[in-house]
Amino acid sequence: MLGVVKSVEVITADITSGLTSVTTSLTKGQNTDNCVPFVTQQNVNATYQPNEWMVDIYFTSTQVVVERTTTGNRIICAVVVVEFDPNRVRVQQKSFSMPLVGGTSTQTVNVGLDYTVDTSRAAMVHHYRQTSGTQSQATDWAVRRNFSGTTQAQFTRRYSDETAQAGHFYVFESLDGAFTTQRIFIEFNSGVGYNTDTISEVDISKSWIVPHSFYSTRTHAEADSNFMFVKFASSTVVEGFRRGTTSYIQVDTFVVEHHDNTVVTHGQFDYASGQQDKQTALPGAVDEDYSAPLATARDGMLYPQVYAGTAYDRYFARIWYSPNTSTIRGYRQSTSDSMQQRWQSIEFAPAPGYYFGGYVTENGSPVVRTVRAYHRETGELLGETTSSGIGGYYYLETTYSGEQYIVCLDDASYPVFNLLAYDLMVPTTISGG
């Protein structure tokens, strides 16, 4: 099966201490309606205030915007913009808000989707900022996401009485089964630092974990009970780790398995005390136009191996390809304390650049026939399909433009084309690209 990703672009958004947002122009002609952003970040200062380090990410028609609420902490974000093929993947881009509401009950907000989703083929990622209040407890800022049925996205946090959160979320859904998804839900009871969730078997070399979301009852800014990572323990088990155990936490995310030529490499950065920069050689060079360097934890959070307090400059690392396309790199600001980070390099199978279709008729009536496309110069078979008995319609995908191929029926072969058979296809329409 052909790929579903049209492009990937990694943007560096440097939000210096005096800025609340950075706007960056995209360079690959993306249709931003079909784009989904992911992020890892490097916190240059030690602040733990969420209104300074938490960022929302959204698009204009040609740009990506990374925005926080207040100035102060410098943040360097690696934003990975994945553009999907709209013929194969439906992207829904919407906003949500968690208003400040008095009381101590758990807050749940449901947002209606524009289209019903097949939850076996859909996943979601969200980005948001703390729009009011300075409360630094994860009970307020940690917002868990999931689908509520097939028509709503659901967002949940423990407390809503001191802060408000708002941002954007992105649903991406395969329309033809090019990828399938499974929900991951892992609970950590108080006193527990490790747990797992079981999934149907996947091919790990074609599967990745959407950066996680979580719900927390930890009423403190210390990161050791909240910051964690998740990873594949096997093809049927996903496991989660945290160091501190002084709270109850729910982790909610998705596994995405591709059924095309997508290749996923998984690994881990071990930041020893005194280490800032980690680089790992990949099995080979990746095509940066179609490759995404991601973490499994939201925002590039690190898993602390020792108690490290509230200095958040050591708890985040951004990830990108550097110094070349054969190397994945993680970089944190502070070198204090030992940390771990799970990474994943996803080299997506490219979506075909061109689509074409037409109708096959004989004596004015639609017929079922094999339709083949060949490269005009080399004779390479670009694809074949069968026309439909309902109208004789056929549809093919190729990476070549219309000027580079010849279409013919099953009684014609390259290099001798049956022009009579070709003429029976009326009309041949070219689209896409």
Regions found by a protein language model. Give the residues of each.
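Extracellular receptor-binding modules and their adjoining Ser/Thr/Gly/Asp/Asn-rich linkers
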Residues: 1-34, 41-44, 68-121, 127-131, ...
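Long luminal/extracellular ectodomains of secretory-pathway precursor proteins
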Residues: 20, 26-31, 50, 96, ...
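Extended low-complexity, serine/threonine- and proline-enriched intrinsically disordered segments
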Residues: 37-43, 53-54, 81, 125-128, ...
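Short, surface-exposed coil-to-beta transition loops
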Residues: 48-53, 74-77, 136-140, 164-167, ...
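Extended hydrophobic/Leu-rich segments
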Residues: 282, 290, 294, 301-306, ...
